[in-house]
Amino acid sequence: MAKRLDLKGVNIYYGSFHAVAEVTLSVLPRSVTAFIGPSGCGKTTVLRTLNRMHEVVPGGRVEGSLLLDDEDIYGPGVDPVGVRRAIGMVFQRPNPFPAMSIRDNVVAGLKLQGVRNRKVLDETAEYSLRGANLWDEVKDRLDRPGGGLSGGQQQRLCIARAIAVQPDVLLMDEPCSALDPISTMAIEELISELKQDYTIVIVTHNMQQAARVSDYTAFFNLEAVGKPGRLIEVDDTEKIFSNPSQKATEDYISGRFG
């Protein structure tokens, strides 16, 4: 668990459109790295590239090197499904299988892998729900539909589903944007706990959230409409928010644009 990601000279295309240019950065294990920047700057595109989710869009391709603990996840013969198992994704809006039970939501990935042993499935469901700080709230209704949970609980259910397959990295695409403040606080506390076991990358438009939950922050920006997004700087979160090295970063986090 908790592996390192290294991007070297990564360029991302959709057909002839150059979406993101020349990204080089390292994401360290057992830490939270926040991707920030204005809409359209490429931060979510880069996030999706980390587990090859961008490939579901026709024409999506990557140039450059993207390593998971020195293994090229775009190397010849590498199975994208295996990559997505090692690098899990939690999306912007909670997306549990609404008619499926809470228990079956959590172990859906294991069942797809062919696991049928009930004891293993039950133990994994409990372990994952505890890991997502949801067990005590749902342990007496595991057979009820996941769609019946509140929005915040559904998002934690999705996190439990992601960690059930024991990934090395967790990607989170604005995981709190659709949640109320209390649910947001619960997710932020959970992120701080999960980083003890996982490498976490989070995309957020909330500067206060980035400052609260992340150890490192990467700022992306767009030169102009039609131009590719670029990584402007990446550093310790405290430095990015107190003394950034680039004026564009300072302007963005101070609210002058974006």
From Swiss-Prot:
Pfam families: ABC_tran (PF00005). This is Phosphate import ATP-binding protein PstB. It comes from the Bacteria. SUPFAM superfamilies: P-loop containing nucleoside triphosphate hydrolases (SSF52540). GO terms for biological process: phosphate ion transmembrane transport. It is found in: Cell membrane. Its EC number is 7.3.2.1. It catalyses: phosphate(out) + ATP + H2O = ADP + 2 phosphate(in) + H(+). SMART domains: AAA. ATP binds at residues 37-44. Coiled coil: none annotated. The complex is composed of two ATP-binding proteins (PstB), two transmembrane proteins (PstC and PstA) and a solute-binding protein (PstS). Part of the ABC transporter complex PstSACB involved in phosphate import. Responsible for energy coupling to the transport system. Residues 5-247 form the ABC transporter domain. GO terms for molecular function: ATP binding; ATP hydrolysis activity; ATPase-coupled phosphate ion transmembrane transporter activity.
